[in-house]
């Protein structure tokens, strides 16, 4: 079966069980799939995980500047609940660049904006990116040289600012770990060196997710 037709859990289980990767895994469909009751993922560049709570939605990552709007549209087709909290897993633009679309959605609805939470290293990363704006655009175009500007991945000449002007700055940061409660849901944020040195992984201890 074509991987585009597989449920994300089915696709990941297939790879884990077989140990064989023979089809695309990191899909950019802009489509939302409910993983469990109240838990969903929008597969994009990058993905956005969404958890429903009694106080609103908790979103993990905002996707990129070219895909954030599509992510919000898919989210809104699934739920009209306000976004309570937006967590950045790290400061790369494909994970934070779509935050402007989330705040535009809030403005249209006339509700309070979400709280943005991230590791403390995200703020100096943004500052560094802004100071080296032209350089970052150049090296990313070289690194991803096979991607044409019209592919709209934010890596070509169509982008004026490496950090989009409407990117939301973190409202709350942490250093090693942070316990967060939204509604009746508990979220444990932990710092780890992953793709970056400002990486966060999120754990729901009650549901082991």
What is the meaning of each model-derived region?
Residues 1-29:
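N-terminal pre-domain segments of enzymes
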Residues 25, 32, 55, 66-117, ...:
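Active-site metal-binding motif and surrounding structural segment of the metallo-beta-lactamase
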Residues 26-80, 201-209:
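Conserved beta-strand hairpin/beta-sheet module of binuclear metal-dependent hydrolase folds
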Residues 42, 54, 98-99, 126-131:
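Short, solvent-exposed loop/turn and secondary-structure capping segments
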Residues 58-61, 85-87, 189:
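Short catalytic-loop micro-motif centered on adjacent basic/acidic residues
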Residues 91-97, 123-125, 196-197:
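Active-site environment of divalent metal-dependent phosphoester hydrolases
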Residues 124-191, 206:
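Metallo-beta-lactamase
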Residues 190-199:
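Active-site glycine- and acidic-residue-rich loops that bind
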């Amino acid at each position: 079966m074509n991987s585009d037709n597989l449920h994300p859990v089915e696709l990941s289980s297939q790879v884990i069980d077989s140990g064989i990767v023979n089809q695309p895994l990191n899909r950019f469909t802009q489509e939302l799939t409910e993983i469990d009751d109240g838990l969903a993922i929008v597969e994009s560049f990058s993905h956005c995980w969404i958890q429903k709570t009694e106080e609103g939605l908790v979103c993990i990552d905002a996707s990129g500047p070219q895909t954030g709007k599509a992510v919000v549209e898919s989210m809104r087709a699934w739920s009209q609940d306000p976004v309570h909290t937006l967590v950045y897993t790290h400061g790369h633009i494909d994970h934070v660049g779509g935050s402007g679309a989330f705040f535009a959605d809030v403005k249209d609805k006339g509700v309070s904006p979400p709280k943005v939470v991230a590791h403390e290293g995200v703020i100096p990363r943004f500052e560094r990116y802004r100071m080296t704006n032209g350089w970052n655009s150049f090296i990313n175009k070289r690194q991803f040289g096979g991607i044409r500007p019209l592919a709209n991945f934010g890596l070509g000449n169509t982008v004026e600012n490496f950090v989009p002007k409407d990117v939301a700055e973190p409202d709350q940061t942490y250093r090693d770990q942070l316990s967060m409660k939204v509604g009746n849901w508990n979220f444990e944020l932990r710092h780890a060196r992953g793709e970056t040195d400002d990486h966060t992984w999120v754990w729901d201890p009650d549901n082991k997710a």
